[in-house]
Amino acid sequence: MADTILEVKNLKKYFKTARGTLHAVDDVSFTIERGKTLGIVGESGCGKSTTGRAILRLLEPTSGKVVFDGKDITSLSAAEMRKMRSDMQIIFQDPFSSLDPRKTVSQTIAEPIIENKILKDKKAIEARVKELMETVGLAQRLVNTYP
């Protein structure tokens, strides 16, 4: 059985507006295994940032459940949530400044693997980069190109 670090169940975040109710996040569910990373990608205004903020309770969810490291954090107090956030991270990226134009696609993908000492062997890092590129649909011919 996989070791789940984050489980999000039926997360919703609605906002009242002059025109009615805006369903910014509507019934989002997913799990993340320990040691894995999740990227939420979508067009502007689709609810990516709101989803992240609701998970961290920087915005209170309208409904749903968030379980972090086996603990339901949905009903934690503000003080407990502040402490819990030290173990959680969300990175909001500006697509125009998120890629270093001096690094190849391969170097960019390998950087967190190397920095976090996930793998040390050069061949293993190269294999993981290749695997990750395949996972997200990046052609291998792009491995040594620049953004």
Positions of predicted regions on the chain:
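The feature captures the beta-strand-to-loop junction immediately N-terminal to the Walker
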Residues: 41-42
